[in-house]
Amino acid sequence: MAPQNPLLGTWRVESFERWTADGTLTQPLGMPPAGYAVFDDTGHAFVQLGRATTTDLSPKDIAQSLMAYFGPYAIDGDELTVTVEASNMAAYIGSHQVRRFARDGDALTLGVEGQYRAKLRRVTA
């Protein structure tokens, strides 16, 4: 029997935090951000997040406030790797995006220590 996939399902982004070079914790997408991460049973991930409210932003800033990518994923222990097939961020295309993750029931934390952290909650209905 194959081990259960701890990420399988749809997850709503509840917060997205980034550390600046001086160690200050910021919320670059505001609170709350908007977005989802979907991990399907065929091994594909779809991630999209951005600002929930963009009415005060210029069209350029709106485009820069959105992060989206997809591709096949693999799990090794508490490490998630997404091989990015396409993204609105050119540097991600063809890259391996590696994140540590932790599950606590329907709560999921993904991130890179000292760089950023996203907190998500499983969508159940």
Locate predicted features:
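Lipid interaction determinants
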Residues: 1-125
